């Protein structure tokens, strides 16, 4: 199953973003995790 890349729409309850990305609960797309 493919992970979701940057700016891909996602659901915070079911975060399928790629490693080092996190689903933004505000914008509802995958954002790069800097920390």
Curated annotation (Swiss-Prot):
Bridged cysteine pairs (disulfide): 3-18, 10-23, 17-30
Tissues where the protein occurs: Expressed by the venom gland.
InterPro entries: Huwentoxin-1 (IPR011696)
Compartments, as annotated in UniProt: Secreted
Any single Pfam family the record assigns to this protein: Toxin_12
Molecular function GO terms recorded: ion channel inhibitor activity; sodium channel regulator activity; toxin activity
Keywords for the protein's UniProt record, in alphabetical order: Disulfide bond, Ion channel impairing toxin, Knottin, Neurotoxin, Secreted, Toxin, Voltage-gated sodium channel impairing toxin
Keyword DNA-binding: no
Additional observations: NMR structure determination (PDB 5I1X) is done on a mutant of 36 residues with an additional Ser at first position and an Ala residue replacing the Phe-7. Functional information is not known on this mutant.
Role summary: Gating-modifier toxin that both inhibits the peak current of human Nav1.1/SCN1A, rat Nav1.2/SCN2A, human Nav1.6/SCN8A, and human Nav1.7/SCN9A and concurrently inhibits fast inactivation of human Nav1.1 and rat Nav1.3/SCN3A. The relative rank order potency for Nav modulation is Nav1.3 (inactivation EC(50)=45 nM) > Nav1.7 > Nav1.2 > Nav1.1 (inactivation) > Nav1.1 > Nav1.6 > Nav1.3 (IC(50)=8 uM). The DII and DIV S3-S4 loops of Nav channel voltage sensors are important for the interaction of this toxin with Nav channels but cannot account for its unique subtype selectivity.
Protein family (similarity comment): Belongs to the neurotoxin 10 (Hwtx-1) family.
The protein's name in its UniProt record: Beta/delta-theraphotoxin-Pre1a
